[in-house]
Design a protein with these regions (language model features):
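Pore-lining transmembrane helices
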Residues: 1-162, 167-168, 172-176
Length: 177
């Protein structure tokens, strides 16, 4: 739910539900929600850094900002990428966030604060089962990153655009070539 609309009503419904459970001392969903909300911008930032041929320069620059937003639990850092290519990007992000949330819940991770990204790690006892939480976050981020690699097409570079590319048939048909 956190990756479906990245800050939209579905995302906010999941977040609000988890925050409401904190008052009842139910802390597992908050951990899953925050980790799953961090996964989309982290995955896009990582993918933009690793797979430069699948992102233009503007997207690679936005990927750097997405990493900072991701560690801060600002899911909206993924919106520019999803808005540009929603049918490829959103399913990849949902898959990774689902993996993150599932590992977090299965591992019994609990988060006693409603926001803060990785900065909550500095608060003593704010995260129960921190190692499992980090594994969940890493696993989901890698799932989304790998999925993005598989579904995003390489972007044409400046030397491969149709206007500057010489067709192979032209060079092969010239005498002496």
């Amino acid at each position: 739910m956190m990756a479906f609309d990245m800050g939209g009503p579905v995302n906010k419904a999941a977040y609000t539900f988890a925050v409401g459970l904190l008052a009842s001392k139910v802390y597992g969903p908050m951990a899953a929600v925050m980790a799953a909300g961090m996964t989309p911008p982290l995955a896009l930032g990582l993918a933009a850094a690793l797979f430069k041929n699948r992102f233009n320069q503007e997207e690679r620059d936005a990927g750097k900002a997405a990493l900072v937003l991701g560690i801060s639990f600002v899911t909206e850092g993924a919106i520019p990428f999803a808005a540009k290519d929603p049918l490829r990007v959103i399913p990849c992000l949902v898959a990774g966030s689902a993996v993150t949330g599932a590992i977090s819940m299965a591992g019994g991770v609990q988060l006693l604060v409603p926001h803060g990204g990785v900065f909550v790690f500095l608060i003593p006892h704010a995260v129960q089962h921190l190692l499992t939480y980090l594994v969940a976050l890493l696993a989901g981020t890698l799932v989304s990153t790998a999925a993005l690699y598989l579904v995003k097409r390489p972007v044409p570079g400046p030397d491969t655009s149709p206007a500057t590319r010489t067709p192979l048939s032209t060079t092969a048909s010239r005498p002496g070539a």
